[in-house]
Regions:
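Alpha-helical segment of the N-proximal tetratricopeptide repeat
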Residues: 28-44
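Conserved small/polar residues in nucleotide/adenosyl-binding loops
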Residues: 262-269
Length: 272
């Protein structure tokens, strides 16, 4: 069965207020961007790209749709090579961002550091060189740092920054001594990204139910010495965006590590 974008249950509208307030020409474009944004949160990047592409057909000057395409082809926590180069898309975003808000322009400018013409031209999918690189991921994380500070309290910006930090060592945030069993942070970056999320949860009640932050927190702590700290975030994801399978499945990453095996199976069953 092939699902249409509108077949997914994204939960209550306030979850994606960032997406529903982007600069664009009409409501149809806005609604399509919301769909793309939801799939982006769900790590369904191919479907997100299709939605963002539809946005650009409806409104070629929707800079954030071009940003979304570039973001979704970039390296991500589950697939470091990414899906391709976002250079052309982000250049288009830069070209049409004149009417955008300051926040949108800042996000577009930051993402432009992640994609270069040289990386695009040297891409070779046969060796999983898709036009992304660790060096470009570092550049993007560094570009997002001042934006995070400028818009502190904006939970979507916080999530984008945290994800940029996590992508610097995807699935390698923690080191385990196989002789002693001791688990320690891989580097200062791990401590930083965990602190950012935990401080945000403490300062903003809405952060505790923010799907992107809850998702990233589960990934950040699942291999840590204290996965149980992510149980509240996991509980949020069980029902927060019920049509998005990856987010509904995410609690099982924590459940398994804290030996809630029955709950883990239930989370996986709900996501299918």
């Amino acid at each position: 069965m092939n699902l249409k974008p509108t077949d997914y249950d994204f939960g209550v509208p306030e979850i994606y207020s960032f997406a529903s307030n982007i600069t664009c020409a009409d409501e149809k474009t806005r609604q399509m961007f919301v769909l793309g944004y939801g799939h982006m949160l769900n790590y369904n990047h191919e479907e997100a790209i299709a939605c963002f592409m539809k946005c650009t057909e409806l409104d070629p000057n929707c800079a954030m749709a071009w940003w979304g395409i570039a973001y979704c082809v970039s390296s991500n926590y589950n697939w470091a090579p990414g899906l391709g180069s976002g250079y052309d898309a982000i250049q288009q975003a830069l070209a049409v961002m004149g009417q955008c808000t300051d926040l949108e322009q800042d996000l577009i400018t930051a993402l432009s550091t992640r994609h270069t013409k040289e990386a695009r031209d040297s891409a070779d999918p046969s060796v999983l060189n898709m036009g992304n690189s660790p060096e470009l991921n570092i550049a993007f994380a560094e570009a997002m740092a001042p934006i995070y500070e400028k818009y502190k309290g904006n939970l979507d910006v916080t999530a984008i920054y945290v994800e940029a930090l996590m992508n610097l060592k995807a699935w390698q945030l923690w080191d385990k001594n196989t002789k002693t069993g001791e688990i320690t942070p891989a580097d200062e970056n791990t401590l930083l990204l965990v602190k950012i999320m935990e401080d945000t949860f403490e300062q903003y009640d809405e952060a505790k139910v923010h799907p992107a932050l809850c998702h990233l927190y589960c990934h950040a702590l699942e291999l840590s010495p204290f996965p149980e700290r992510a149980l509240p975030a996991a509980d949020v994801l069980r029902t927060r965006m019920p049509g998005l399978g990856h987010l509904v499945h995410m609690p099982s990453h924590i459940d398994a590590w804290v030996c809630l095996l029955y709950t883990s199976d239930a989370a996986d069953e709900s996501s299918s």
